[in-house]
């Protein structure tokens, strides 16, 4: 895959996690296939996109979100963008804290080697959520999630959100490994939209 294609798909993976977070906070549910793919990316150590995400189908939610971000922004997508920017900032802080980074890497390796459940199983999600809470959750400013209180007060939903935020950090790391930078969006907007259109065509 060419460089811009890799960067676009990696950026879509960030927006996918934040879209799923927003879906959970707003409705208590999220797209199952994209959720599975994003959570699975946490325990996939490769920097090759085709190894982290098996197909474009794994990133449909993220690709759709990126198209909206680059097109006509809605009020809902603005929240998704804010979460994404917060994750990019949080990942930058994490990269400056080697102790915390080592702790997260070690715990993810343990989860990968010891987990008997599917990554989207409640037990696995709870472990990922606890890892996020005990590490990244302590960095300021914390990511504040907006949504319906009935869902945000549900333990399983909050665990799920934290697990997806961890997946979001993984997505940011993947995006940066592909040379992704926020200013690229300004100069490559048309190319990215054309690329998204071609990806959508492949999915039909």
From Swiss-Prot:
Membrane topology, as annotated: Peripheral membrane protein
Residues spanning the membrane: none
Subcellular location per the Swiss-Prot or TrEMBL entry: Cytoplasm; Cell inner membrane
Statement: the UniProt record of this protein carries the keyword Oxidoreductase: no
GO cellular component, one term: cytoplasm
Domain of life: Bacteria
Pfam families (alphabetical): DUF489
Keyword Transmembrane: no
Keyword terms, alphabetized: Cell inner membrane, Cell membrane, Cytoplasm, Membrane
InterPro entries in UniProt: HflD, HflD-like_sf
Family: Belongs to the HflD family.
Name used for this protein in its record: High frequency lysogenization protein HflD homolog
Naturally occurring in which organism (per UniProt): Ruthia magnifica subsp. Calyptogena magnifica
């Amino acid at each position: 895959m060419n460089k811009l294609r890799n960067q676009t798909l990696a950026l879509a993976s960030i927006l996918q996690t934040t879209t799923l977070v927003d879906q959970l906070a707003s409705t208590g549910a999220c797209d199952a296939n994209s959720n599975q793919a994003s959570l699975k990316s946490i325990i996939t150590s490769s920097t090759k996109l085709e190894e982290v995400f098996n197909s474009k189908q794994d990133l449909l939610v993220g690709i759709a979100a990126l198209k909206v971000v680059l097109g006509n922004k809605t009020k809902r997508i603005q929240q998704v963008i804010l979460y994404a920017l917060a994750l990019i900032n949080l990942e930058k802080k994490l990269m400056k804290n080697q102790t915390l980074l080592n702790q997260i890497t070690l715990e993810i390796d343990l989860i990968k080697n010891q987990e008997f459940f599917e990554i989207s199983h409640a037990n696995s999600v709870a472990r990922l959520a606890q890892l996020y809470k005990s590490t990244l959750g302590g960095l300021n400013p914390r990511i504040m999630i907006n949504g319906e209180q009935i869902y945000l007060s549900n333990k399983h939903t909050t665990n799920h959100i934290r697990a997806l935020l961890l997946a979001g950090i993984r997505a940011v790391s993947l995006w940066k490994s592909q040379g992704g930078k926020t200013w690229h969006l300004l100069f490559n907007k048309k190319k990215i939209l054309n690329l998204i259109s071609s990806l959508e065509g492949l999915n039909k």
